[in-house]
From Swiss-Prot:
The keyword Transmembrane helix does not apply. It comes from Homo sapiens (Human). One of its GO terms (cellular component) is nucleus. A motif (HMX family specific domain 2) lies at residues 276-289. It is found in: Nucleus. It holds the Pfam family Homeodomain. It is linked to Oculoauricular syndrome: A syndrome characterized by microphthalmia, microcornea, anterior segment dysgenesis, cataract, ocular coloboma, retinal pigment epithelium abnormalities, rod-cone dystrophy, and anomalies of the external ear. PANTHER family: HOMEOBOX PROTEIN HMX, HOMEOBOX PROTEIN HMX1. DNA-binding protein that binds to the 5'-CAAG-3' core sequence. May function as a transcriptional repressor. Seems to act as a transcriptional antagonist of NKX2-5. May play an important role in the development of craniofacial structures such as the eye and ear. This is Homeobox protein HMX1. Residues 61-70 have a biased composition (Basic residues). Residues 96-105 have a biased composition (Pro residues). Residues 29-203 are annotated as: Disordered. GO terms for molecular function: DNA binding; DNA-binding transcription factor activity, RNA polymerase II-specific; DNA-binding transcription repressor activity, RNA polymerase II-specific; RNA polymerase II transcription regulatory region sequence-specific DNA binding; sequence-specific double-stranded DNA binding.
Length: 348
């Protein structure tokens, strides 16, 4: 009778062992305990009765147990293929692992477990358990990114040396060329943003500065005529040594200013109280006695006293043929100097 197969002492399963491996090991331990009890009872029975059928059944059971151990250890004929088919490729580190998927480093089905515990070594019974360093400290994101090729690598020392050699070959003019290129980039970016650059923005239009004589001549012409024809504008521009566009713009600005002044005066007149703007002439109640009456003697006394004579009103600024007089402030349009001046015909 062959010697019974005894299992060596099993160590505590590693923390990195998968749930499936732990279940298989637990089932194996239970089967081994039952096999040991069955072997003792069968030995007693074999001592009493040597039955060849019981011996064949025991050998078949032992062969099944051996195949299970080989399956867990990944040894024996077809053991690796069966382990891969049962536990998935790369789960036990049997052979090369498949490339990780595009998912996050710890997602299931994307090689996360293989990247978490990439290295394994042989343990009890030819089994596999993760390395202690891998079990205690997972890989950092940088190492996983390098393994997957997701992060670009920086330039090595060779690239720096090549760039230094190129700059040395180009000479001192290389620095000025690079500076000019860098200066052109913000300028081009400013032009693309609607012509607003970083330095000064849009081009500011130059403002024409008129001399005192030119302003006096322009003001005099404006007092006579608000709008100029093309011939008058050309003659005035030639006499003042200005362009027709400059004369035209000056007249436009001057007309706008004149309109604003008129609007302000009308608004001030509408806000002032109307009683202060109207003056009424009071008729004289009595006249002085003529010289003949004065020589005859004083007039007879009246039974009632006469009211004192009202003071004479101030002379009106602008008189009319009626009994009423109004001050000039009642007519703000007439108060302006240009209104009093004669207007030339031909207004546009």
């Amino acid at each position: 009778m062959p010697d019974e197969l005894t299992e060596p002492g099993r160590a505590t399963p590693a923390r990195a062992s998968s749930f499936l491996i732990e279940n298989l090991l637990a089932a194996e331990a239970k089967g081994a305990g039952r096999a040991t009890q069955g072997d003792g009872s069968r030995e007693d029975e074999e001592e009493d009765d040597d039955d060849p059928e019981d011996e064949d059944a025991e050998q078949a059971r032992r062969r099944r147990l051996q195949r299970r151990r080989q399956l867990l250890a990944g040894t024996g004929p077809g053991g690796e293929a069966r382990a891969r088919a049962l536990l998935g490729p790369g789960a036990l580190g049997l052979g090369p692992r498949p490339p990780p998927g595009p998912g996050p480093p710890f997602a299931l089905g994307c090689g996360g477990a293989a990247r978490w515990y990439p290295r394994a070594h042989g343990g009890y019974g030819g089994g596999l358990s993760p390395d202690t360093s891998d079990r205690d400290s997972p890989e950092t994101g940088e190492e996983m990114g390098r393994a997957e090729g997701a992060w670009p690598r920086g330039p090595g020392p060779g690239a720096v040396q090549r760039e230094a050699a190129e700059l040395a070959a180009r000479g001192p003019a290389a620095g000025t060329e690079e500076a000019s290129e860098l200066a052109e980039v913000p300028a081009a970016a400013g032009e693309t943003r609607g012509g607003v650059g970083v330095g000064g923005g849009r081009k500011k239009k130059t403002r024409t500065v008129f001399s005192r004589s030119q302003v006096f001549q322009l003001e005099s012409t404006f007092d006579l005529k608000r709008y100029l024809s093309s011939a008058e504008r050309a003659g005035l521009a030639a006499s003042l040594q200005l362009t027709e566009t400059q004369v035209k713009i000056w007249f436009q600005n001057r007309r706008n200013k004149w309109k604003r002044q008129l609007a302000a005066e009308l608004e001030a007149a509408s806000l002032s109280p109307p009683g202060a703007q109207r003056l009424v002439r009071v008729p004289v109640l009595y006249h002085e006695s003529p010289p003949a009456a004065a020589a005859a003697g004083p007039p007879a006394t009246l039974p009632f006293p006469l009211a004192p004579a009202a003071p004479a009103p101030p002379p009106p600024l602008l008189g009319f043929s009626g009994a009423l007089a109004y001050p000039l402030a009642a007519f703000p349009a007439a108060a302006s100097v240009p209104f009093l001046r004669a207007q030339m015909p031909g207004l546009v």
